[in-house]
């Protein structure tokens, strides 16, 4: 006896179309287009979760460097001085201090001044 895919197909299509909500035009309404777009969007999401980490680190480096240059030193010298002084502040915290609490960043810079 031949078995048709009625219920299984409907469930599979509903699952894909539910995930495709918010897509534009036929990419939301037509199963094949929605499935293709969904595969692409999942690929982009996976790739960009990795890229986000790189982009944030480079943003933190730029912010720390800008704050260091205001005090006549460079990012690389400052980071080396932090390592030598055994101060374990990460780039995220340092960038936040440079943006929101310049006084604290200046005090950190003064504490590593002898290691520069």
Swiss-Prot record:
What is a single molecular function from GO for this protein? Answer: structural constituent of ribosome
Q: Kindly list the GO CC terms recorded for this protein.
A: cytosolic large ribosomal subunit
Q: Which keywords describe this protein according to UniProt?
A: Ribonucleoprotein, Ribosomal protein, RNA-binding, rRNA-binding
- PROSITE patterns (alphabetical): RIBOSOMAL_L20 (PS00937)
Q: Which GO terms describe its biological process?
A: ribosomal large subunit assembly; translation
Q: What does this protein do?
A: Binds directly to 23S ribosomal RNA and is necessary for the in vitro assembly process of the 50S ribosomal subunit. It is not involved in the protein synthesizing functions of that subunit.
What name appears for this protein in its UniProt entry? Answer: Large ribosomal subunit protein bL20
- What is the name of the gene encoding this protein? rplT
